[in-house]
Amino acid sequence: MSQAAETLDGWYSLHLFYAVDWASLRLVPKDERDALVTEFQSFLENTATVRSSKSGDQAIYNITGQKADLLLWFLRPEMKSLNHIENEFNKLRIADFLIPTYSYVSVIELSNYLAGKSDEDPYENPHIKARLYPELPHSDYICFYPMNKRRNETYNWYMLTMEERQKLMYDHGMIGRKYAGKIKQFITGSVGFDDFEWGVTLFSDDVLQFKKIVYEMRFDETTARYGEFGSFFVGHLINTNEFDQFFAIS
């Protein structure tokens, strides 16, 4: 049996994707529609207060294409807090006009593939804590996709030795480092939580960097032989004070 990688786990993560039911929303009188939007704004401003206390974070993006219109990403210390947020969100009047198109449940994760030997408690390391319990950037663009490590008769990631996996992940990581300062990456583990094994969330002020890094990594052995991917979602930052314009119907 191959040695399993150990992980450090941080905040729990919930990506929620919605399409707006514009046809139904168009039938709502403007004053009622304005009230729906105001209630939605207040809800998100209230859930965002965790950032100041460093007990979670969140991001809101307008997704490009027909897979979704909105992405709400929540990070919290406990899974049940994500349940509470989702339940309260579903009670909002605006939820009657938002159609769920996708969701992803996971937890911020760091593996030990590239970690050196140390007697230090990693959870007390400031650099590691900042990655496990992050303050999300307000970058212009976001890209999210789920992924698996392939396991079949020809290529099975889980049958490789720890040393083989460490070498592959080192080479893989070297590509990622080339994009430092251009892309901020968050890996969330989802084995036992969702249909894929990991979620990858990328932030950048230059949307083209997503294409560049994903394409370059296609030639990396870790991805070429062992990577399997779900759908990609790309979107632009939207602030709650822009909701009036976003939901406006002339």
UniProtKB/Swiss-Prot annotation:
Cofactor(s) needed for function: Fe-coproporphyrin III
Class of the enzyme per the UniProt entry, highest EC level: oxidoreductase
EC numbers for this chain: 1.3.98.5
GO MF annotation list: heme binding; metal ion binding; oxidoreductase activity, acting on the CH-CH group of donors, oxygen as acceptor; peroxidase activity
Keywords assigned by UniProt, alphabetized: Heme, Heme biosynthesis, Iron, Metal-binding, Oxidoreductase
Superkingdom assignment: Bacteria
Coiled-coil boundaries: none
Pathway per the UniProt entry: Porphyrin-containing compound metabolism; protoheme biosynthesis
InterPro entries for this protein: CHDC (IPR031332), ChdC/CLD (IPR010644), Dimeric_a/b-barrel (IPR011008)
Chain sites annotated for binding Fe-coproporphyrin III: 131, 145-149, 172, 185
NCBIfam families assigned to the protein according to its UniProt record, in alphabetical order: PRK12276.1
Similarity comment: Belongs to the ChdC family. Type 1 subfamily.
Protein name (Swiss-Prot/TrEMBL): Coproheme decarboxylase
Species this protein is from: Staphylococcus aureus (strain MSSA476)
